[in-house]
């Protein structure tokens, strides 16, 4: 249970489970894991700590990466869907310009970023994944893709070289597709929600402009 959720703690307390974890770590465990506050890693550390106290041998290594475990057929389908929209001979930068509430960046923010990416990476396609709301903060300037199937979306993103998007479910889906993910953070705490692994990085947009974002993209593409 998330330790800040009182209703969650009550629900767990009333459950019939033999063992119940209420989402708290000791100072000692937190000192061992500087990333303990990350929402994907915290439950793993809690479970490992509990199992260790029960006498089980537990892993000590990094928390495994999120992984959709896309198979070869799904990946091939994702690439085929991408190739329908862009120049197949070029590699692709994938973007998602939507998010909920205050996490959503305005067209005035996104359009300069999009134009900078086009200028800095003329040899790359840029494709946009759309939300269910069918809105684009770049006014549908790039080829767009949408699916009701999250695995199909993940496979589409996996066919790209890098993904850029605000803190959202699609950002985490991109990370789980094993695509290097640039997570944009302006109002939420990146240390709790940042994408991790596979070259993914959080970006504080309060101090990072379009050119700096493009520099980070260039660094990822150069490693590719």
For the regions a language model picked out, list residue spans one by one.
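Catalytic machinery of carbohydrate-active enzymes
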Residues: 1-224
